[in-house]
């Protein structure tokens, strides 16, 4: 049975997240319905990252097995035809070995969090960025972010309902970059805890606003207590950019 790797882009706003839910619309559910319409069989679509409600993707990766063989480009086109009207696009498909697993074969996941730092309201990017009206010291944010690099117990920065067996993760990259009013927080790691990226972003915004210092961020990390975390950033600005294998 051929296995196909999909690279997918989506707007997370109308979905309850990636993961299939009984009633609410999910990205996984939309793709599985498209696969059923394409090949006439129930197919499970496995994603590399289980993004939360409202979180977007530029390069989510998934795999699926289909009994009927398809040319990769024809499968892509058929899935795109059937996934409408959802804001989901299958960017590419390729045949991969049976040993490939979208989630477990991944060696690194890259996320970007987009902030617009201005007092004026959003007009064109509502639901796509987090508008922070108070001026942010992005140099201070970047310096503080380096406290979180490396292997740590990230209990402070994970959701209380996170089901991961261990709170330890290794963060490879956490950069804060400004271009005019736009502030990007870029992070890379093999894997993350539930709500970890948004929790780190919210705490870094407190640093940028002058509410916290780098030492305060370090103390929050060391506390290993969820209540020590700063605010959790909204999902609007978070994008799964790329998955490495």
From Swiss-Prot:
It comes from the Bacteria. Keywords: Isomerase, tRNA processing. Its EC number is 5.4.99.12. Homodimer. Substrate binds at residue 111. InterPro entries: PsdUridine_synth_cat_dom_sf, PsdUridine_synth_TruA, PsdUridine_synth_TruA_a/b_dom, PsdUridine_synth_TruA_C, TruA/RsuA/RluB/E/F_N. The active site is at residue 52. CDD domains: PseudoU_synth_EcTruA. PANTHER family: PSEUDOURIDYLATE SYNTHASE (PTHR11142), TRNA PSEUDOURIDINE SYNTHASE-LIKE 1 (PTHR11142:SF0). GO terms for biological process: tRNA pseudouridine synthesis. Pfam families: PseudoU_synth_1. Signal peptide: none annotated. Belongs to the tRNA pseudouridine synthase TruA family. It catalyses: uridine(38/39/40) in tRNA = pseudouridine(38/39/40) in tRNA. GO terms for molecular function: RNA binding; tRNA pseudouridine(38-40) synthase activity. This is tRNA pseudouridine synthase A. Formation of pseudouridine at positions 38, 39 and 40 in the anticodon stem and loop of transfer RNAs.
């Amino acid at each position: 049975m051929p296995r196909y790797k999909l690279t997918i882009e989506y707007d997370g706003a109308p979905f309850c997240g990636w993961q299939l839910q009984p009633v609410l619309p999910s990205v996984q559910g939309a793709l599985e319905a498209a696969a059923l319409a394409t090949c006439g069989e129930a197919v499970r679509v496995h994603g590399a990252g289980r993004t939360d409600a409202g979180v977007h993707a530029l390069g989510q990766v998934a795999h699926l097995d289909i009994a009927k063989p398809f040319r990769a480009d024809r499968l892509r086109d058929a899935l795109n035809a059937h996934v409408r009207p959802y804001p989901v696009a299958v960017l590419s498909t390729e045949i991969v070995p049976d040993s490939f697993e979208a989630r477990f074969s991944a060696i690194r996941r890259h996320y970007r969090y987009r902030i617009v730092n201005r007092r004026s309201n959003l007009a064109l990017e509502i639901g796509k960025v987090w508008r922070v009206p108070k001026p942010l010291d992005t140099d201070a944010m970047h310096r503080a972010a380096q406290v979180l690099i490396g292997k740590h117990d990230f209990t402070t920065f994970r959701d209380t309902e996170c089901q991961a067996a261990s709170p330890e993760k290794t963060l490879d990259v956490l950069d804060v970059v400004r271009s005019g009013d736009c502030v990007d927080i870029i992070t890379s790691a093999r894997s993350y805890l539930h709500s970890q990226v948004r929790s780190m972003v919210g705490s870094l915004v407190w640093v940028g606003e002058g509410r916290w210092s780098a030492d305060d961020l370090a103390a929050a990390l060391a506390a290993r207590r969820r209540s020590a975390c700063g605010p959790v950033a909204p999902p609007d600005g978070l994008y799964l950019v790329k998955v490495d294998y």
